[in-house]
Regions:
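Short, charge/polar-rich alpha-helical segments
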Residues: 29-49
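Generic structural signal for well-ordered, non-transmembrane alpha-helical segments
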Residues: 42, 49, 56, 82-85, ...
C-alpha cells in the first residue's frame, strides 16, 4: 500500500460537496439571468433611441415635402412615420415588460437565495460532522 491513502468519500463528503455546488450554481444562475435581462433592456433602449431618431428625420422629411407641395413624398413620409410610431410603441411595451421581468427576477433571486440558506446550513453541518470524525480518529493515533 502507498504511504498516502486516498480519503474515502462518504455520504457526508458527498452531501458537503453537493450542497456547496448547489449554492454556487444557484448564485451563478441568478446573476447570469439578471445580467442577460439587463443586456436585453439596454438593447431595447438602444433600438428605441434609433427609432426615435428615424421618426424625427421622417417628420422633417414630411415637413419638407409639405412645403414643396410633393403629395407623393408626403404620403411616403406619412407611411414611414406610421410604421416608426408602431415600432416605438412596440419597443416601449417590450421595455416595460422587460423592466417588470427584471423586478420579478430580483425578487425571485432574493427568495431563492434566502431559501437556499438552509442548504448552506446542511453544508456546514456536514463539514462539522466530518471535522468531529477527523478529530476522533486523530486522538487515538496521537495517544499511541
Amino acid at each position: 500500500m502507498s504511504a498516502k491513502q486516498k480519503p474515502v468519500n462518504t455520504p457526508l463528503h458527498l452531501l458537503q460537496q453537493l450542497s456547496g455546488s448547489l449554492l454556487e450554481h444557484l448564485e451563478e444562475a441568478c446573476s447570469q439571468a439578471l445580467a442577460d435581462a439587463e443586456k436585453l433592456l439596454a438593447k431595447l433602449e438602444k433600438q428605441r433611441g434609433k427609432a426615435q431618431e428615424k421618426l424625427h428625420n421622417g417628420r422633417l422629411k414630411l415637413q419638407d415635402a409639405a412645403k414643396a407641395g410633393k403629395a407623393k413624398a408626403q404620403t411616403k413620409a406619412q407611411k414611414a412615420i406610421g410604421e416608426l410610431e408602431e415600432l416605438l410603441d412596440s419597443l416601449k411595451e417590450r421595455q416595460t415588460q422587460t423592466r417588470s421581468y427584471i423586478q420579478q427576477l430580483k425578487r425571485d433571486a432574493q427568495d431563492s437565495l434566502k431559501l437556499a440558506q438552509g442548504v448552506g446550513k446542511v453544508r456546514e453541518a456536514a463539514a462539522k460532522a466530518l471535522d468531529q470524525r477527523a478529530a476522533k480518529t486523530s486522538k487515538p493515533a496521537a495517544a499511541k
